């Protein structure tokens, strides 16, 4: 069986629910797979029985060298795929000929572009940022073109941000593992419960959603919000005092807590501005809603209707 190394950009304790099922369950029928994660706490590599390899954060810049030091034979891998991080991709490509493996690049979400768009929304984007973005994009395209395959979340993501990539492209959208679906729990209240999970900032324009709810002239609904941006949420809610009694702020500590809250709701919310960043991939919150059998109101765009 061919060996496959998947180098992620994620911490060992972050949510891997959309990496794990594909690379640690379904593809293991066809490949012997190792998946790497990083740790800020650990000082030495840990190799788990399930194929995970935990690498100290300090070794990030020389990951292949660190793997070899720990008796992991890189010559045994036929395929190496890097997730999101082009610095890691650059190191892997330098060793491609030496170890004779094929290289892929997985783009789950364009994080650098997201930061640029957020800076634009906050009036922090300068001409230097625009020039730097063009240079970085050119460099990234060249790196991806050295790969054997490009694995974006959607063709729209490729066309919007990496249209000059010429290598073979195979789309891998985020998905739900059918083995870990959650039951939808009917709540006892008569009100309709709406749920929003995720980031709140100026770029996402959540005040548009609040504005819509503020026009409802009855109290037969509840808007539940779980976010890691509570201060930003408080600032927004201060502009809509008539919503206070209809809003419940939730503090989900982890994904399991979040899914339990979602399962008690009637409708999920994922209404986002009509910009390329949000139109090119399905937000994780949508998959969280669907995995608990909760329907979702989302933006109308080509990606969401496909």
Give residue spans per PLM region:
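N-terminal subdomain of nucleotide-sugar transferases
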Residues: 1-44, 75, 211-217, 301
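Conserved donor-binding/catalytic core segment of Leloir-type glycosyltransferases
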Residues: 5, 151, 186-204, 209-214, ...
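Nucleotide-sugar-dependent
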Residues: 12-14, 201-204, 256-261, 268-290, ...
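Glycosyltransferase donor-sugar binding loop
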Residues: 40-42, 197, 222-236, 251
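Active-site proximal beta-strand in glycosyltransferases
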Residues: 79, 96-121
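Membrane-proximal helix-turn-helix segments that form the acceptor-binding/catalytic region
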Residues: 90, 105-115, 126-150
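Carbohydrate-associated surface elements
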Residues: 156, 175
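Nucleotide-activated donor-binding/catalytic signature segment of Leloir-type glycosyltransferases, i.e.
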Residues: 234-267
């Amino acid at each position: 069986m061919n060996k496959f190394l998947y180098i992620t950009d994620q911490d060992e304790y972050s949510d891997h629910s959309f990496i794990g099922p594909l690379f640690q369950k379904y593809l293991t029928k066809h490949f012997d797979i190792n998946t790497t994660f990083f740790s800020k706490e650990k000082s030495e590599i840990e190799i788990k029985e399930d194929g995970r390899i935990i690498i100290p954060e300090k070794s990030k810049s020389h990951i292949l060298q660190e793997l070899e030091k720990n008796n992991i034979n890189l010559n045994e891998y036929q395929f190496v795929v890097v997730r999101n991080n082009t610095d890691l991709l650059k190191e892997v490509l330098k060793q491609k000929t030496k170890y004779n493996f094929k290289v892929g690049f997985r783009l789950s979400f364009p994080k650098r572009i997201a930061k640029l768009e957020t800076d634009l929304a906050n009036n922090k984007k300068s001409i230097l940022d625009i020039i730097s973005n063009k240079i970085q994009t050119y460099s990234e395209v060249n790196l991806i073109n050295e790969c054997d395959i490009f694995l974006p979340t959607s063709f729209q993501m490729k066309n919007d941000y990496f249209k000059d990539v010429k290598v073979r492209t195979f789309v891998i959208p985020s998905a739900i593992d059918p083995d870990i679906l959650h039951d939808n729990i009917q709540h006892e209240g008569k009100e309709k419960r709406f749920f929003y999970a995720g980031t709140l900032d100026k770029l996402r324009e959540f005040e548009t959603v609040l504005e819509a709810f503020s026009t409802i002239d009855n109290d037969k609904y509840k808007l539940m919000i779980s976010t890691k941006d509570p201060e930003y949420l408080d600032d927004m809610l201060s502009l809509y005092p008539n919503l206070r009694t209809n809003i419940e702020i939730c503090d989900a500590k982890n994904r399991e807590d979040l899914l339990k809250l979602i399962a008690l709701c009637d409708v999920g919310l994922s209404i986002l501005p009509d910009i390329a960043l949000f139109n090119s991939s399905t937000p994780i919150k949508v998959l969280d809603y669907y995995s608990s059998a909760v329907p979702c109101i989302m933006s109308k765009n080509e990606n969401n209707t496909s």
